């Protein structure tokens, strides 16, 4: 095969021309003198049509019948070079069709495990390396790619510098009970939960920084929203106020949604996502409500017929049902701000005049997707941070570099983090986070 290849996504530019595409066969149908071949090449899906009389006319009866028979006997996931004339076809769900003039098999495929019938989740996860080839899984990966692309674009446009934090660390950024421990030349080390502590050092040097990479949480959770390994975007910035931080977070999430609408509209169509809802999340302002007001709202509505959550008192943390109700009540992504210090991280700065609450926010996505962003202002006063660590019984020697940041020109600063998989799940409208990452790592799954 010496002809120049084109991608399926570009066929609209070649109407009336003969092209060659490298692709995999996803399905075939037809009978008698006609064969339909469903194709994919990673960029999009497409249909080719082969007519027996055309093959006989072009190649002669013996060769034409032989070539046509090869097409009729194609198996699912056989890889091929297929040549044909691109034609517009309003009847086709693709808008275009390929009038096949030649086909060459590259790699055979026999007894492909994932047939068009329904399969159980465990079977599909055991064959994740193959399940990724399906239309919906490819669509989710395209949305993931669009979100990652939009992340880099947004932070570049807003003056942030990419700042890489280490994967191995000797201390915890969050809950120390959720750490994966490993041996580091005879000393204990831990897989990173977050790059935040190191990003704060970056913010003191470069002003605005962000990190994007894998993080690890040893949570023994089986919910549809948790992974033990996932990709986190963390951002840190100096000299911004709490309200300015919320403005930045809102702009970022809206940029991600817009990025998917711009770069992966066909993926949203495949997943049958409510695009009008996504557009509304861009145009309407996000809601902001204090933790205490949210608790009061929950208490006022807990007797409603359509509620399904446990009673909470002021000082209690939300569960998933509470987060779902809050975001659905407002109908748009909702910031819950100023949580109790009692169950938030040691580094969060107290609300001025109210040390029981901290300057933080969780962004809750509507439609039942829950928290997608967590952020806060950081305690920038050395003495106050030391006092908090002493109160919690923390070993300050493990955080000497972090405390140094408060000793040499400390400034007001804050940051936030977003689990990319949660954002992908929300924008794609999928039911489980395991589909938002190529190879999910969960409580009872570490392969393939």
Curated annotation (Swiss-Prot):
Keywords from the named record: Aminoacyl-tRNA synthetase, ATP-binding, Cytoplasm, Ligase, Nucleotide-binding, Protein biosynthesis
Pfam families: tRNA-synt_2 (PF00152), tRNA_anti-codon (PF01336)
Domain of life: Bacteria
InterPro entries, per the entry: Aa-tRNA-synt_II, aa-tRNA-synth_II, aa-tRNA-synth_II/BPL/LPL, Asn-tRNA-ligase, Asp/Asn-tRNA-synth_IIb, NA-bd_OB-fold, NA-bd_OB_tRNA
GO biological process: asparaginyl-tRNA aminoacylation
PROSITE patterns assigned: AA_TRNA_LIGASE_II
UniProt cross-references to Gene3D superfamilies, sorted A to Z: Bira Bifunctional Protein, Domain 2, Nucleic acid-binding proteins
EC class: ligase
Compartments where located: Cytoplasm
GO MF, one annotated term: asparagine-tRNA ligase activity
Reaction equation(s) it catalyzes: tRNA(Asn) + L-asparagine + ATP = L-asparaginyl-tRNA(Asn) + AMP + diphosphate + H(+)
One Gene Ontology CC term in the entry: cytoplasm
E.C. designation(s): 6.1.1.22
HAMAP family: Asn_tRNA_synth
Subunit structure: Homodimer.
Protein known as: Asparagine--tRNA ligase
Organism from which the protein derives: Streptococcus pyogenes serotype M12 (strain MGAS2096)
Phylogenetic lineage: Bacteria, Bacillati, Bacillota, Bacilli, Lactobacillales
């Amino acid at each position: 095969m010496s002809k120049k290849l084109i991608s399926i996504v570009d066929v609209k530019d070649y109407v009336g021309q003969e092209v060659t595409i490298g692709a995999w066969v996803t399905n075939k149908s037809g009978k008698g003198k006609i064969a339909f071949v469903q194709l994919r090449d990673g960029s999009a899906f497409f249909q080719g049509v082969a007519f027996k009389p055309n093959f006989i006319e072009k190649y002669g009866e013996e060769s034409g019948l032989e070539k046509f028979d090869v097409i009729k006997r194609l198996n699912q996931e056989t890889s091929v070079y297929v040549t044909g004339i691109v034609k517009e076809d309003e009847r086709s769900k693709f808008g275009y069709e390929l009038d096949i003039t030649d086909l060459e098999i590259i790699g055979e495929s026999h007894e492909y495990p994932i047939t068009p019938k329904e399969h159980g989740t465990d079977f599909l996860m055991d064959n994740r390396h193959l399940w990724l080839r399906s239309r919906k899984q490819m669509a989710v990966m395209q949305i993931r790619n669009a979100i990652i692309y939009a992340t880099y674009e947004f932070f570049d446009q807003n003056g942030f510098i990419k700042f890489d934090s280490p994967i191995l660390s000797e201390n915890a950024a969050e809950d120390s009970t959720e750490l994966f421990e490993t041996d580091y030349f005879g000393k204990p080390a831990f897989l990173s939960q977050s790059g935040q502590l190191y990003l704060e050092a970056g913010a003191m040097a470069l002003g605005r920084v962000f990190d994007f990479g894998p993080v690890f949480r040893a949570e023994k959770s089986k919910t549809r929203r948790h992974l033990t390994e996932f990709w986190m975007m963390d951002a840190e910035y100096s000299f911004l106020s709490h309200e300015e931080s919320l403005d930045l977070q809102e702009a970022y999430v809206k940029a991600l949604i817009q990025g998917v609408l711009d770069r992966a509209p066909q993926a949203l169509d495949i997943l049958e996502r409510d695009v009008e809802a996504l557009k509304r999340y861009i145009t309407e302002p996000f809601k902001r409500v204090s933790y205490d007001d949210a608790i009061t709202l929950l208490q006022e509505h807990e007797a409603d017929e359509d509620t399904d959550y446990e009673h909470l008192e002021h000082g209690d943390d939300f569960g998933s049902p509470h987060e779902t109700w809050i975001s659905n009540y407002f109908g748009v992504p909702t910031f819950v701000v100023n949580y109790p210090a009692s169950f938030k991280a040691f580094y969060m700065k107290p609300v001025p005049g109210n040390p029981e609450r901290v300057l933080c926010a969780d962004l809750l996505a509507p439609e039942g997707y829950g928290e997608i962003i967590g952020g806060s202002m950081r305690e920038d006063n050395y003495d106050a941070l030391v006092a908090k660590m002493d109160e919690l019984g923390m070993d300050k020697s493990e955080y000497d570099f972090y405390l140094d940041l408060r000793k040499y020109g400390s400034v007001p600063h804050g940051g936030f983090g977003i689990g990319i998989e949660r954002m992908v799940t929300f924008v794609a409208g999928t039911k489980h986070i395991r589909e938002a990452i190529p190879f999910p790592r969960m409580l009872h799954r570490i392969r393939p």
